[in-house]
Amino acid sequence: LVYFNSDTLRVEDTAGILRDTTQVFRDYSAWYHFVITLDTPNATANDRIKVYVNGSQITSFSVLTNPTQNQSLSWNNNVNHNIGTYASGTYHFGGYMTEVNFIDGQALTPSSFGEYNADTGVWQPKRYAGSYGTNGFYLNFSNNSNTTAATLGADYSGNGNNWTPNN
């Protein structure tokens, strides 16, 4: 679960809060590119969860809890997953999402999803070109003709892992 809490970015699991950034995100008109990697087999505890914003790794957290090595988290497990809200229906995302990539079985860096513009130095997204893995998905929200799993929630990774939009 990734959401905003008092203008900070929070990464949480059923085990509790894992990361809460000290950086705040108060510019509601700004565009942000977030990459969260989970790699619980990693021998370095602080590298098991990484948070990147606009291509730069965030290293300052008010809460930093590491999963144990090889710990199975609720992400990518047989539990209900939500995008844009907490499982209880709270913490609704008050913004726009242009796309969501979920890569199963790899802990990738932001360079897989974006790059700095050579002329402006501004971080910009790029289309992911690799494998999504068995449970991976790519939501680009391009078909907004209806709010169904075959339209707005359609998975464009080729895996058919469609989502059912819900208000």
Regions found by a protein language model. Give the residues of each.
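Extended recognition patches within non-cytosolic domains
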Residues: A43-A45, K50, I58-T65, Y96-N167
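Generic preference for hydrophobic/aromatic residues in regular secondary structure cores
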Residues: L1-V2, L9, G16-T21, S60, ...
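Extracellular glycan-interaction patches encoded by glycine-rich segments
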Residues: S72-M97
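Short surface loop/edge beta-strand patches of beta-sandwich-type extracellular domains
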Residues: L18-R26, Y86-G89, Q124-A129
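Short, surface-exposed beta-strand/loop "edge" segments at domain boundaries and coil↔beta transitions
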Residues: A15-D20, G89-H92, N146-T148
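Beta-strand-rich, repetitive solenoid scaffolds
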Residues: L1-N5, R10-D13, T37, V51-Y52, ...
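Extracellular/periplasmic catalytic domains that process cell-envelope and extracellular macromolecules
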Residues: Y3-F4, D27, S74-N77, G130-G133
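Extracellular glycan-interaction surfaces
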Residues: V2-N70
